[in-house]
Structure formats: C-alpha cells, structure tokens
A protein has these predicted regions:
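Hydrophobic/aromatic beta-strand patches that form the interior of the parallel beta-sheet core
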Residues: 37, 67-69, 187
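Conserved nucleotide-binding/hydrolysis micro-motifs of P-loop NTPases
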Residues: 34, 72-77, 161, 191-195
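Short glycine-/polar-rich loops that comprise or flank the Walker A/P-loop
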Residues: 62-66, 182-184, 208-209
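Short, well-ordered alpha-helices that flank and scaffold nucleotide-derived cofactor binding pockets
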Residues: 29, 53-60, 86, 176-179, ...
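P-loop NTPase nucleotide-binding core
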Residues: 42-45, 49-153
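Helix-loop-helix "sensor" segment of P-loop NTPases
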Residues: 198-209
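A short, basic N-terminal segment
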Residues: 1-37, 42
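Conserved Walker B catalytic segment
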Residues: 124-193, 201-203
Length: 209
C-alpha cells in the first residue's frame, strides 16, 4: 500500500501550509496592534494551524513570546492552571535555565517535573508544589506574563470549555486577570459559535466588549 503523501491533520511547518495568506496577514496585524482576537470556526477547519503559522511569522516570532494553550480536555479550574503552566514551560525549555528559573520563582505554587519515556526522550509536566487554591496559581501565572522580558501573545484554544467548569465566576475571574495583565495580547479560539457568541456578545457576560 502506498503511503499517503498529503498531510491530513496537524501543522507541519510553513512549507506545507497552503493558502490563508490574507487570514495570516490579518491575524498577525491585529495582534501586533495590540488587539485581542476571537477566532471561531468548526473543529478541524484549521484554527490551530492558522495560529501556529501566524506565530511562526518573523515579525511575531522575533518580537513576542507565543503560547498556544489547548483546554479542550480540561474540566475545571485546576486543569486550566496545569494546561497554562505546561504550555508556558514547554516554550521556556529551549531558552535555558535562566528562563526556567524565573518561571519557577514567580509561579512558586507549581513545580516542573521531568520524566523520561521508553525512547529516552524527556517529557515535562506540572504539579502543585503544595496544596493551593488554583486561583492563587492562576494569579501567579498572570503575574509571570505581566513581568515577562518581552510582549506575549497567548492563544487559548477551545476557550468555550470554561463555561462547563464547576467553579463559580470563572469568566469573571479570567476577565479581571486578563484586563490587569500587562504586556499580553490574547486570542480566544473555539469551535462552538453559539457559546462563544454568548460569551462575547451578551451584555450580561463578563467578556462582553
């Protein structure tokens, strides 16, 4: 059987990313101008690929820290904290010990844990360093972003998942933290047009603009 030469899912780099020139230009332009962005489309329509491609553009990659956080599998605020911490950690690892140490010092309620898979490759995860309210860890993560050495772009994929968290006022808590977070532009990406529209268009919701 012949191997399929075509990429059917995922992002494999700019040389395999077809079309969406205008979308990439529009998105990078909005982010560079300091605009938060809501990105909606059905699942498997290329939102994540567009974000990764935009993050890889020279004008973005050379000037910003970029973090892509997928929260589709999260079910509560603690899961969100771990997803954010792990995504930030994975971007910091190639930058060396100094960057990692600053993260660990600022976000003291979380600690990075390294394990090795059967192939000998290191894997990093996040664990609580002590029993803390996840809201406290979230505060520390946002503090880290505000004090970053250069501007950040944070994309939260499947953002509508926070609607289903059991904790109260998650939207209001995140809205407050995001408003206070300096130095950071946000992308709220999701596949549920109905839920995202309600979150950002309804005057009764915290993210109403």
């Amino acid at each position: 059987m012949l191997k399929n030469p075509f990429i059917t899912y995922g992002y494999e780099g700019p040389e395999y990313f077809c079309d969406r020139v205008q979308e990439t230009k529009s998105l990078t332009g909005l982010l560079q101008n300091g605009n938060n962005v809501v990105l909606m489309s059905p699942r498997r329509m290329g939102k994540t690929g567009l974000l990764m491609h935009s993050f890889g553009q020279a004008e973005v990659a050379e000037e910003y820290n970029t973090f892509l956080i997928d929260i589709y599998a999260t079910s509560n605020l603690q899961d969100l904290v771990f997803s954010m911490g792990k995504a930030i950690l994975s971007q910091l690892m190639p930058r060396g010990q100094k960057a990692l140490s600053r993260f660990v010092k600022t976000v003291s309620s979380l600690r990075p844990v390294m394990s090795v898979d059967i192939m000998g490759n290191p894997n990093w995860s996040i664990e609580p360093s002590r029993s803390e309210d996840p809201s406290y860890s979230l505060d520390q993560i946002f503090k880290y972003l505000s004090e970053s050495d250069r501007p950040n772009i944070v994309a939260i994929d499947e953002f509508q998942q926070i609607v289903f968290y059991p904790e109260k006022n998650v939207e209001a808590v995140l809205r407050t933290l995001i408003q206070r977070c300096k130095n950071t532009v946000w992308v709220f990406s999701g596949s549920s047009r109905h839920l995202l529209s309600e979150m950002f268009i309804s005057p009764a919701r915290p993210f109403y603009a």
